[in-house]
Amino acid sequence: MRYLPLTENDRREMLGVIGAKSVDELFRDVPERARREGLVDLPRRQGELEVERMLGRMAAKNTPAASVPFFVGAGAYRHHVPAAVDHLIQRSEFLTSYTPYQPEITQGTLQYLFEFQTQVAMITGMEVANASMYDGATGCGEAVLMAHRVTKRRKAVLSGTLHPQYAAVVQNLSDFADYELEVMPPALPGQAEDILAHIHDDISCVVVQTPGFFGELHDLRPIAEAAHAKGALLIAVVPEILSLGAVTPPGEMGADIVVGEGQSIGNGLNFGGPYVGLFATREKYMRQMPGRLCGETVDADGNRGFVLTLSTREQHIRREKATSNICTNSGLCCLAFTIHMSLLGEEGYKRLARINHAAAVKLAERLAKVPGVEILNQAFFNEFTMRLPKPAAEVVDALVDKGVIGGLPASRLLPGVAEVEDLLIVASTEINTEADRAAYEAALKEVL
């Protein structure tokens, strides 16, 4: 007996229900240039060895971050990950585990999530943290939705310090969640952003990033005071979580919700994902927090144990009452974060942050000596922005030809903004050596 799960009649019936004439109509949003007609012309009857060689030749056309001096950041940072991290997360109990619905058989998973939450709460200066989001951007979007629930208001203000891709996620949610956004223009380093003038009685929250998209560190205290005076919440976004080892945590500056990207700890660049979103808030807002919360308890015999304390998502309760519809979280990335953070310890975390800051300062001092280069930042962590005498995209391409990946042209994420055409965002971490910095300085002198 043959099982045919989708016949032509099935397709016609399904298309009729949704009002589409053909399957192709379902993909009309995909640009024509991105579509492929027919089968891919692959070589036939190749053995495993031949396939490996062919793929190796294709891969050799790329320039891996580890093979050249690499100075790209802007939300994804290359840090050293201890070998112990990957070794431990590949244990089958962790690698293939699922959501810990049955605490009697998932104590290991629940405990590391509990430890993860504790670490996130400590470094952000908040009282409670959840068991992670998909990434920093989705965490930011969920934070805005949470602020609406808490304040019963429907308008948010996005600072120009916010990463454009984070802002795009929030804007995407606003289109479907029926709330209003006020998006401020990019906050260039050295230029004061008049965000206080945009905080009114009708807003639910103000979203500010530190370090900002251009690397600038920001004092959140005056913004927090202004927001609280109007009954609004302050959402602090931290795309480089290692920075909290060197600066005052957002929670201590008055933030009500802190979201961030945890990729820098325990995780590689991973081709842009999967990453691990961090989400922390104050205890009084805990029941409005999205995602899951693991808690500590005791069993019937008085033994310490861990459980899913809160999990108010649409799978468990009525959709209209759920705080989010987030499903499988970034559990394995959480574990990598937790292991790396445990290996570092509090002092190691702070020391690594100091090393990163020193690396960026040394690079900025070198590049500032190059004729035509201007460092714009007054205060930064491990990332800064410089103004060049020609378009930054052209300079980056020329640097690649010299064997240096020199940073991210701001225009790549802010197309059409004339003020950023000559701005290059540069990151330097503990990975970068003095030889890397010297190579960058020499290459930049040549291409300018």
UniProtKB/Swiss-Prot annotation:
<keyword id="KW-0560">Oxidoreductase</keyword>
<protein>
    <recommendedName>
        <fullName>Probable glycine dehydrogenase (decarboxylating) subunit 1</fullName>
        <ecNumber>1.4.4.2</ecNumber>
    </recommendedName>
</protein>
<dbReference type="Pfam" id="PF02347">
    <property type="entry name" value="GDC-P"/>
</dbReference>
<dbReference type="InterPro" id="IPR049315">
    <property type="entry name" value="GDC-P_N"/>
</dbReference>
<dbReference type="GO" id="GO:0019464">
    <property type="term" value="P:glycine decarboxylation via glycine cleavage system"/>
</dbReference>
<dbReference type="GO" id="GO:0004375">
    <property type="term" value="F:glycine dehydrogenase (decarboxylating) activity"/>
</dbReference>
<comment type="function">
    <text>The glycine cleavage system catalyzes the degradation of glycine. The P protein binds the alpha-amino group of glycine through its pyridoxal phosphate cofactor; CO(2) is released and the remaining methylamine moiety is then transferred to the lipoamide cofactor of the H protein.</text>
</comment>
<dbReference type="InterPro" id="IPR015424">
    <property type="entry name" value="PyrdxlP-dep_Trfase"/>
</dbReference>
<dbReference type="InterPro" id="IPR015421">
    <property type="entry name" value="PyrdxlP-dep_Trfase_major"/>
</dbReference>
<dbReference type="InterPro" id="IPR020581">
    <property type="entry name" value="GDC_P"/>
</dbReference>
<dbReference type="GO" id="GO:0009116">
    <property type="term" value="P:nucleoside metabolic process"/>
</dbReference>
<dbReference type="InterPro" id="IPR015422">
    <property type="entry name" value="PyrdxlP-dep_Trfase_small"/>
</dbReference>
<comment type="similarity">
    <text>Belongs to the GcvP family. N-terminal subunit subfamily.</text>
</comment>
<dbReference type="InterPro" id="IPR023010">
    <property type="entry name" value="GcvPA"/>
</dbReference>
<comment type="subunit">
    <text>The glycine cleavage system is composed of four proteins: P, T, L and H. In this organism, the P 'protein' is a heterodimer of two subunits.</text>
</comment>
